[in-house]
Swiss-Prot record:
GO terms for molecular function: 2-isopropylmalate synthase activity; metal ion binding. PANTHER family: 2-ISOPROPYLMALATE SYNTHASE 1, CHLOROPLASTIC-RELATED, HOMOCITRATE SYNTHASE-RELATED. InterPro entries: 2-IPM_HCS-like (IPR050073), 2-isopropylmalate_synth_dimer (IPR013709), AIPM/Hcit_synth_CS (IPR002034), Aldolase_TIM (IPR013785), LEU1_arch (IPR011830), LeuA/HCS_post-cat (IPR054691), LeuA_allosteric_dom_sf (IPR036230), PYR_CT (IPR000891). This is Probable 2-isopropylmalate synthase. The gene is leuA. It comes from Methanopyrus kandleri (strain AV19 / DSM 6324 / JCM 9639 / NBRC 100938).
């Protein structure tokens, strides 16, 4: 097993082949910058010959002078390789299919012809002075003796790395281990693997390959890619670090940030139960689990959420226990007696039994009712009026009128959209309270269907003292849902300051 593994990210090439995904040049550059900041070794920027826009995107990324090696994909065809070279990449990833099914039905050529084409492609790319990585497409369904012959020949032709693609995800970890070990023994250059997730084993197969000596793994952010996707960058990286103790020069605390960026730009939603970066990756509802996590996080968490840029959440519902609810109340700054806590727990479970998702706002409302503390109507910030103007020919503008500790104040601001303008106006208004509140996270989801859907907005806010809170707002208007969430969050932070 190698001491260090290279991370070859193909989000911008194979990941963009996800059905329905198409990124602009600017979006691809933005993702490339973030990948470089994260620390991947290679960024496969695209397939330069595919289109003019793809060529421009690859060339733009190559011109960013990033620390990562910039790679372009090319068939073993001179025109493809020329396009990659013209895009000024550091590395050309050349490939040709080698399985009999691909040779017969797609390429319509013999094994001998494919071998000759592979050698010519590698030699041509190598003669241009770039790093050359060679892939035998559909390697895992290729005759083993022929596959090894192809790899040996391409290394002799000048390949700096060889890649073993499990193109349709048919391998099991033991089989992937055996194949990778054979390739490692056959060549004297680093071996890479590229695993697809058709049977849900892309990550497991990638790790098995590393155990067998592979020194590089192809991955995509959030595991996006054709069909069922590719090996997930975040899962492979954290497994290598946490389970194998293998050296990686990456900033794991950026994983969630990177995941959210790709989710936003591609429109491919990350399921909440996704390992490492999913919304529920560090969420606990069961009373037994949440009790354990509150006392000692390692009881039910294999890694720390902050190590990947995530946060721990104690979720309220019918499975929630006293310790979890008490901890949540403490975070809200609400002190309760044991008797009051019993009643709050009873009401929370009652809501959960009715199938209701118990939010922080629900818990706060229940607690205020039980404890009899200051009602929300007497909060530090009360929104009296908001007006937002937007259109296709002028900048979105928002004006607000609020009461701050009973005194009326007005503010206005512009923004990149209606929500941004409204939040900026509110931030300007609350400066009168001596508060500087930053919006750290924003999430929108439609609770119901249709154009009049009820929207729920979740915001995470942080004040100048580092206090953090999460608040939600729901309304049929996205701007109003956002404003409600922001005002509720500010009031929670203000209450903590007073306490």
């Amino acid at each position: 097993m190698p001491d260090r593994v290279r991370i070859f990210d193909t989000t911008l090439r194979d990941g963009e082949q996800t059905p329905g995904v198409s990124l602009t040049v600017e979006e691809k550059v933005e993702i490339a910058r973030k990948l470089d900041e994260f620390g991947v070794d290679t960024i496969e920027a695209g397939f330069p010959v595919a289109s003019e826009g793809e060529f421009e995107a690859v060339r733009a990324i190559a011109g960013e002078e990033l620390d990562a090696e910039i790679c372009g994909l090319a068939r073993c065809v001179k025109g493809d390789i020329d396009a990659a070279i013209d895009a000024d990449v550091d590395c050309v990833h050349v490939f040709i299919a080698t399985s009999d099914i691909h040779l017969r039905y797609k390429l319509e050529m013999s094994r001998e012809e494919a071998l000759e084409r592979a050698i010519e492609g590698v030699e041509y790319a190598s003669d241009h002075g770039v790093t050359v990585e060679f892939s035998a497409e559909d390697a895992t369904r290729t005759d083993r003796d022929y596959l090894l012959e192809v790899y040996k020949a391409t290394v002799e032709a000048g390949a700096d790395r060889v890649n073993v693609p499990d193109t349709v995800g048919v391998m099991t970890p033991p089989e992937m281990y055996r194949l990778t070990a054979e390739v490692v023994d056959a060549v004297d250059v680093p071996v890479s693997v590229h695993c697809h997730n058709d049977f849900g084993m892309a990550v497991a197969n990638s790790l098995a390959a590393v155990e067998a000596g592979a020194e590089q793994v192809h991955v995509t952010v959030n595991g996006i890619g054709e069909r069922a996707g590719n090996a997930s960058l975040e899962q492979v990286v954290m497994a290598l670090k946490a389970l194998y103790d293998i050296e990686l020069d990456v900033r794991t605390e950026m994983l969630v940030e990177l995941s959210r960026l790709v989710e936003r730009l591609t429109g491919v939603v990350v399921p909440p139960n996704t390992p490492i970066v999913g919304e529920n990756a560090f969420a606990h509802e069961s009373g037994i689990h949440s009790h354990g996590v509150i006392k000692k996080a390692e009881t039910y968490e294999p890694i720390r959420p902050e190590d990947v840029g995530h946060r721990r959440r104690i979720v309220l519902g019918k499975h929630a226990g006293r310790h979890a609810i008490k901890k949540k109340l403490e975070e809200m700054g609400i002190e309760v007696t044991e008797e009051q806590l019993d009643e709050i727990v009873r009401r929370v479970k009652e809501l959960g039994d009715k199938g209701k998702r118990v939010t922080e706002d629900d818990l706060e409302a229940i607690a205020r009712d039980v404890v009899g503390e200051v009602p929300e109507s007497e909060a530090a910030v009360k929104l009296e009026e908001i007006a937002v103007m937007t259109g296709n020919k002028f900048t979105p503008t928002a004006s607000v009128r609020v009461y701050l500790d009973g005194e009326e104040h007005e503010a206005a601001s512009t923004g990149v959209g209606s929500v941004d303008a409204a939040i900026r106006a509110l931030r300007e208004a609350i400066e009168e309270l001596g508060m500087d509140v930053e919006l750290k996270e924003y999430r929108l989801e439609a609770i119901t269907g249709g154009t009049d859907a009820l929207a729920e907005v979740t915001v995470r806010l942080e004040d100048e003292d580092g206090n953090v809170t999460t608040a939600r707002g729901a309304a049929e208007d996205i701007v109003m849902a956002s404003v409600k969430a922001f005002v509720r969050g500010v009031n929670r932070l203000a209450r903590r300051r007073r306490d």
